Each structure stands twice: as C-alpha cells, then as structure tokens.
Amino acid sequence: MAGLKDFQKFLGLLFGLIAFPAIGQVPKIGSDTTLDVGTWNVEWFGDSLNGPSNEVTQLKNVTEVINNMDLDVLGLCEISNPGYWAKLQGNLPQYGAVITTYTQTQKTALMYKKSMFRLLYSKSILLAFDYEFASGRFPLEVALESQWGSKKDTLYFWVIHLKANTGSTSEKLTSYNRREKAAEELKNYLDPKKSWKGMVLGDWNDDLDASIVSGKASPFLTWRSDTNYVFPSYRLSLAKQKSTASYSEMIDHMCVTASLKDNFLSNQSGVMVGDSYIASYRLNTSDHYPVWAKFSMDFKVWVGVESLEPAWRETMGIPCQLLVFDLQGRLLMQGDPETVKPAATGMYLLQYVYPNGARKSVKVYVR
C-alpha cells in the first residue's frame, strides 16, 4: 500500500505542475529608500460567476503578487467578494486596508503598510455623477498620515475605475464620452486642492497618448496638458507597454498632483507583467497587470549631529562592513564603519553586513 500511496502522491504533484507550473518568482519592487506605489485591477476578485474560475487559486496568486512586490501603497479595482477580501487582508497582516461602500459589485480599495501610514479617513466622492462613473463606481478618497520622520504629513489617494470600452461602435463612443466626463469632474474636484499631496490610482480604461477608441484623442488630454499633474505611467504609454494580458494599450494609470509631482523619480515606473512569473496568469489571476511608480520622500531619522557616528556606535566590537546608498538605491561607498562617512548633507540608507551574512539597515539624515 505504501508504494501505491507514493505513486498517487507523485501523480498529484505531476498534475499540479501541469496545471500551474512555476515560471519564476514575482519580483520585489519595493525599497527601503523610496515610497513605492501601485495600482492593480484584480479582475472580479473572489467572484464565483465572473473572472478567473478558481477563486482559491486567484487568492493565492494575488497574495503572492502583493507580498513579493512589497509596495507601500496599492490601489485595487474589482474587489467582488467580501469573504475573499477578508481572506486577502488576513494573508497580508502588514497592510491596512479600506474599501469603498458603493453598491456595485466591483469595488475599489486601497492597501497601505501599517508601519508607514495611519488611516485618517476614507469616503466616496462625486456622488452626483453616477452615470459618468460607470453607473455608480464612484472615486474612493483616502487620507493617510505618514509615520516616518520628525514631522507627520498627509497623503491623499483616489482610486478610480472608469467605464469599460465594450459593445458596438456607438456604445464604445458613449463609453468614451462617459470616461471623458468622469475624468473632467474628478479634475474639477482636484484642481482647487493643489496644496494636497495626492495620487490618482486605478483602471482608467483608456490610454494617455491616444484613445483606445479609433480616431479619438485621449479622454485625459486636459490632465496631460496641465502642468499641475504628472502621470508616471505616461512614459509607459509612449513606450507602447501594456497593462492588460489581452490588449496592447496602457489603460491602468497613476497621476500625481502638483504638491507631489517633483517627488516622482523620473523613469522609475513600470508594469509587472504577471504571466512572466505565474503560469496561466490570465486565467487564474487577472486580466490586468500591476502598474507601479517610485517616489523620493523625506524618510528622515534625525540624528542631530554632524556625522553618522550614532548610527554605527552599536556596531563597536562587532566586525562588519558598512554600505551607504542614496535615495535611489545607488551604492555610494563602502568600507569600515569608522572610516566611511558621507560628507554631503542629505538622507542615506546605511546597511551593515556582518560576517555571518546578516544585514541590518537604518536610515539616517546627515546635516
């Protein structure tokens, strides 16, 4: 019987590999030196009638993607089952989360690292524009208070899911007009709030360089031409990257408001192409890929002295090597902790490497 059981176990493993063979590990995007933000439409997440057919596998894969990417803030679209939403939060205890309260099944949500932010409030906005916002998929507004440095700051996030481009030619034109009007109303809402440090995340369901509707300009042209806003995803549109598994356009975007646009690290945005890492990604995870961007923030740990001495004082008597990185993750210098001292004022990430291979990181500000 033991031989039979071993054979059955072998068959189970074999068929498991055939169904969902491993391709590679989802890459880490997050960094200790940057604020890492993303947006992802998780296609009918948890819904038994739509989207991926195996909700358990979808939950597993979505958990893996979020864990491995290690973003600080993530906007989500199409959360469609409260039970699976609760399971996802249980799988990711490092994140706090809020979800919209509108009645549509496909809901928007925001996840944020609890070590970095405290929730101030969340609410749906622009409730007078039900039709424009895909018949009730109102923008989710979330205010988070930063938990780093000597001074607290408030960051605002808006998660949106605009009208999809489906149906006949005339229906697609109608959907285009609804996306354009919804974007206009959201911009009207945000324009007076130039002092707010904010980001708009989500499935915009159209591209930035030109519309996915043949012969039409991007419905977000007024945003793109306004210097008070920057789209980290615009460079991806120009590079002809795509944010879905089935189509060739970028329809998932991130937009940064005036008070935060200078924090975007130029050229540090991208798409996590899911089917490069998860087999049958389109069938068992989502029809969209996560889109991400990196920002330089004031992650200050005030040392209050002219050198980094307090930061390495703890290593006295313990042989180690010190690596010094800038905010973009570039190695600036390395060597003995007592001789490696950045002279320029600024923020640094120090990493101590011990003989046993262990590493410890600390952020310091030199002034």
What does each model-identified segment do?
Residues M1-V26:
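Bacterial Sec-dependent N-terminal signal peptides
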Residues I23-Q94, Y102-Q106, A183-E184, I278-Y281, ...:
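N-terminal, active-site-proximal structural segment of metallo-dependent hydrolase catalytic domains
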Residues Q25-P27, P82, K123, A134-G136, ...:
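Metal-dependent phosphoester-hydrolase catalytic domains
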Residues T33-T34, S48, T154, A210, ...:
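Coil residues (strongly favoring Ser/Thr
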Residues V37-V42, V62-W85, M111, V142, ...:
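Active-site beta-strand/loop signature of hydrolases that rely on acidic residues for catalysis
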Residues G46-S53, L71-E78, L127-Y131, S168-N177, ...:
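Second-shell loop/turn segments in exported
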Residues V73, I79-L162:
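Structured beta-strand-rich core segments of catalytic domains in phosphoester-bond hydrolases
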Residues G304-R367:
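C-terminal outer-membrane/trafficking sorting elements
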